[in-house]
């Protein structure tokens, strides 16, 4: 039996607890002694997993709590939800990504301007090549360049003769180089998707060299007739299309442009060899412009 002079250890423990903990501890558990602001701040950081390098998001959260303290004391727990936080951080993210989007837009504009310039210069060079293409029979100089005069006449008619002729040739080069990329976006065939690796700078240079070799070979070889030269060139064009590209959109573009050039100058065609001659030259030219346009618009 315990002596009356000795203190009861159970009562002593209860007295210490009543002195160190609030009286409402039994009702609210440890929420009374926990800092509410610190708890909300830690909870927000855990839920969003804020990166330490993106200091602007931390500043957004800190400024939110600062305004809340300044207006009405501590921020109530139920007013800070994940949706509100996502809105705040999304606004901060948009502000951070705005300079990069502006830079990307500027780069895209410069990229397309570069493509337009190169295609326009190629159109002018293509006209000069057509003027020097001939054989020793019916295919005389300047004969292949007649379809290109249609674009120049159209530009002069639209501008009342203000624009120079070389600008019309540049517009034709731009149109020739843009037909195949437009057809690629329209059809989106498996052949086009599988031939992306062919659209390289090396492939473009090879196609240009092939065109120059074929056109000047027509001039140097002694053909028995113009029909023989045009027929051999037509068979070679099919081989070059299969070797350099092989896509349906490229074939359709080359055929349509070749037929269109023949129709535009049907009054000047007096022999079947001349029809094939127009078809061969503009088929191969469309192949070269198609490769160049694909490369410029996709790189």
Curated annotation (Swiss-Prot):
It comes from the Eukaryota. The keyword NADP does not apply. Disulfide bonds: none annotated. Residues 130-161, 259-268 are lumenal. One of its GO terms (molecular function) is unfolded protein binding. GO terms for cellular component: endoplasmic reticulum; endoplasmic reticulum membrane. Keywords: Endoplasmic reticulum, Membrane, Phosphoprotein, Transmembrane, Transmembrane helix. GO terms for biological process: sterol biosynthetic process. The chain crosses the membrane at residues 109-129, 162-182, 238-258, 269-289. The modification Phosphoserine is found at residue 90. The keyword Phosphoprotein applies. Residues 1-108, 183-237, 290-299 are cytoplasmic. It holds the Pfam family INSIG. Stabilizes the HMG-CoA reductase HMG2 by preventing its HRD1-dependent degradation. Binds directly to the sterol-sensing domain (SSD)-containing transmembrane region of HMG2, promoting its folding to protect it from degradation. Belongs to the INSIG family. Present with 3390 molecules/cell in log phase SD medium. This is Protein NSG2. It comes from Saccharomyces cerevisiae (strain ATCC 204508 / S288c).
């Amino acid at each position: 039996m315990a002596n009356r002079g000795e203190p009861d250890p159970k009562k002593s423990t209860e007295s210490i607890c009543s002195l160190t903990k609030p009286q409402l501890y039994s009702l609210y558990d440890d929420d009374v002694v926990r800092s509410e602001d610190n708890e909300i701040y830690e909870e927000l950081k855990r839920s969003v997993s804020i990166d330490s390098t993106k200091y602007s998001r931390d500043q957004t959260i800190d400024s939110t709590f600062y305004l809340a303290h300044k207006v009405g004391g501590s921020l109530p727990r139920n007013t800070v939800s994940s949706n509100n936080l996502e809105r705040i951080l999304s606004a901060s993210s948009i502000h951070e990504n705005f300079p990069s989007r502006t830079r990307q837009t500027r780069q895209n504009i410069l990229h397309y301007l570069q493509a337009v310039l190169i295609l326009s210069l190629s159109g002018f060079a293509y006209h000069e090549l057509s003027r020097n293409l001939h054989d020793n029979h019916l295919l005389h100089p300047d004969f292949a360049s007649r379809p290109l005069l249609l674009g120049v006449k159209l530009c002069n008619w639209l501008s009342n003769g203000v624009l120079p002729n070389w600008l019309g040739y540049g517009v034709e080069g731009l149109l020739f180089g843009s037909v195949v990329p437009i057809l690629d976006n329209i059809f989106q065939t498996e052949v086009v998707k599988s031939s992306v690796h062919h659209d390289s700078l090396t492939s473009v240079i090879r196609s240009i060299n092939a065109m120059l070799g074929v056109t000047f070979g027509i001039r140097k070889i002694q053909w028995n007739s113009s029909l023989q030269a045009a027929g051999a060139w037509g068979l070679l064009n099919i081989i070059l299309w299969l070797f350099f590209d092989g896509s349906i959109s490229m074939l359709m573009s080359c055929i349509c442009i070749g037929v269109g050039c023949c129709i535009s100058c049907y009054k000047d065609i007096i022999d079947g060899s001349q029809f094939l001659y127009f078809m061969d030259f503009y088929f191969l030219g469309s192949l070269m412009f198609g490769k160049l346009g694909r490369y410029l618009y996709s790189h």
